[in-house]
C-alpha cells in the first residue's frame, strides 16, 4: 500500500506543473486522496468485507467528489486531476500511468451482470467530461478528447474526439515522456478544407472572389495548449 501511495504522489508531481512538492500533493490533491481511498476500499472488497468497502468508498466520495466502486481495478500511478465529478463503475479496469481529468465517467451499459464497464490500457489520457461506456477496451497510449462519448473499442495509440467518439489520428509520445498534450482541431481543419474547395470552384467557374484569403488561424493541430483540462 505504501509503495502504491508513493507512486501516486510521484505521478501527480510529474503530470501537474502546479504540484511543486510532495507535501502539497499529500494534503491538497483530492484526486490523489480519491485513489488512496479506493485502494483501501478495494482491499476490503477483495477480502469479502463488502459493507465496509462500500462505506469507505462512500466516505471517499463525500470527501473528494470522486465516485469509484470498490470493485473497480485501478492500476499503479493513476492520477485523477481536478477530481470533481469522476465516476468509475464496478467492473471497470484502469491500467498503469493513466491520467483522468474532471467529469469523466467510465460507465456501464445495460442492467445485465458480468463485465459491463470499460477496460482502460496503460498510459491512456482521458480528457475532461469524456464518457467511456460499456465493456470496451481503450488501447494503450490512447487519448480521449474532452467531452467525447466513446462506445466502441479504441486501438492503441489512437486519438478519439467527438460524439460519438471517432478515431481521428495517432497519439505521439513527447520526447520528455508519454504525454503529448496536442489535440487535433477538427473545426479548423474542416473549415480550411471547405474554403480551399470553394476557392477552387470559384476559380473554375470564373465567379467573383472576395478580396484576400479567409483561413482559420491554424489548420489541423493547435500547438502548445492542453485542451484536456
Swiss-Prot record:
Broadest EC class assigned to this enzyme: transferase
Pfam families, per database record: Hexapep
Q: Which domain of life is it from?
A: Bacteria
| EC number from the UniProt entry | 2.3.1.30
Enumerate the catalysed reactions: L-serine + acetyl-CoA = O-acetyl-L-serine + CoA
One cellular component (GO) term of this entry: cytosol
Question: What InterPro entries does the database record attribute to this sequence?
Answer: Hexapep, Hexapep_transf_CS, LbH_SAT, Ser_AcTrfase_N_sf, Ser_O-AcTrfase, Serine_acetyltransferase, Trimer_LpxA-like_sf
The Gene Ontology biological process annotation of the record reads: cysteine biosynthetic process from serine
Query: Which Gene3D superfamilies does the annotation name?
Result: Hexapeptide repeat proteins, serine acetyltransferase, domain 1
CDD domains for the chain: LbH_SAT
Record key words, sorted:
Acyltransferase, Amino-acid biosynthesis, Cysteine biosynthesis, Cytoplasm, Repeat, Transferase
Report further notes. Answer: Was identified as a high-confidence drug target.
State its role.
Catalyzes the acetylation of serine by acetyl-CoA to produce O-acetylserine (OAS).
Designated name of the protein: Serine acetyltransferase
For this protein's source organism, the top of the classification is: Bacteria, Bacillati, Actinomycetota, Actinomycetes, Mycobacteriales
